[in-house]
Amino acid sequence: MFVRVKKAAAALALGSFAVAGAVSVAVTPASPAGAASSGSTVTIADLCSCTGPEASSISQTSDTMQAWASWVNSHGGLAGHQVHLVILDDGYSAAKALTNAETAINQDHAVALFDNSDEDPSFAATVQSAHVPVLGGQESDSGYKNSDFFPAGATFNYTNSVGAIFAKDAGVKKMAAVYCVEVAICAESVHQGQVVAAHYGIKYVYVSSIGFAAPNYTAQCLAAKESGATAMTVGDASSVVEHVVTDCAAQGYTPRELSGDGTVAAAWLKIPAFNGNIDSQADNLWFLHNTATSTMYSALDKYAPGVPSGPNFGEIVLQSWSDGALLQAAVKAAGASAATPLTSAAILKGLYGLPTGETLGGLSPALHFVKGQPANNSCFFEMGIKNGKFVALHGGTTICAPLVKAGTLPTSH
């Protein structure tokens, strides 16, 4: 229902951001794959699609992970080990993404990886065979199919189900869906969305692919209007969503806009046609200032002030921060200390041993991982736009879609 491009959220006008370096100045000595460096430094790698037609928002995740590492290091590190963060950009190349993962594991000797890549299927088998845990994947097929991925929130297989629940509650019966032609998952999400939506009495009456570089989307807007759709989902980068919504409004067509996760951006608040927008989020809501988000905001304000003040500050930032918080929770659950090396095996032990109902201090729905099984979490947060402001819906609590077998997609309930 909520067709989304994984991590393709912010305005493409932001330009590109590519990093292959470290937050910490410490150099990681050579050591076996999955083993921590000697001394008090541990390497973590952030694999990202930092450049490409759908990825300018990834600069926010890189800045966020750097801020996370700096904050952790200034507060004692991971169980006494200083974090050496390496950020590797695949540029939307599957081959490069695989090379980056191999480099992170075999050369940088990273004991854990953050997934900010749209090409993660290319390295999923590699990281699994190396037994190096991947933190993240809330917006990824790998996040619910591969047991080596540990999403710090709801899993992607339930996105359309919970989107259909939200749409039904809003009285939607006819939907329009336009989606990016550049990334395969866009079309795949639409197909699955149609199947799930039908169970909730919602029909997709107009579906069309769009290109991010199109001069306008007037034709699609007029066709969607003619179809009688009262709601629309745009599976593309945030700037493209803005363009579509603005073009449709110019044609006198203002359907309720449905979206979620990384797509939502602060710039939407200035566009009247977004009023009434409804979004699903795999983690808690980034715009809330409360005990759950206080540490994130403190770290961003100190180490990456351009992130929260930017026009495209959004949920993708909180998701990335949550991935870091999950790693911290796993290290704590493993009982790691500065006296012993921090290894991939220890982190995996901690991930499987998280306390029952772990929410990372309120950042996520309750998390639970089972050894040998992919993550399976159907609980999302709901938000929207009302009178030019982001608002938490459903009392700020989660709404859960019916569970299906781990590693599978819901088709009907």
Language-model-detected regions and their locations in the chain:
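C-terminal region of N-terminal signal peptides and the immediate post-cleavage residues
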Residues: V19-S40
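Periplasmic-binding protein-like
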Residues: A104-S117, L135-G137, K174-Y179, G228-S238, ...
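Extracellular/periplasmic bilobed ligand-binding domains
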Residues: A130, S189-W286
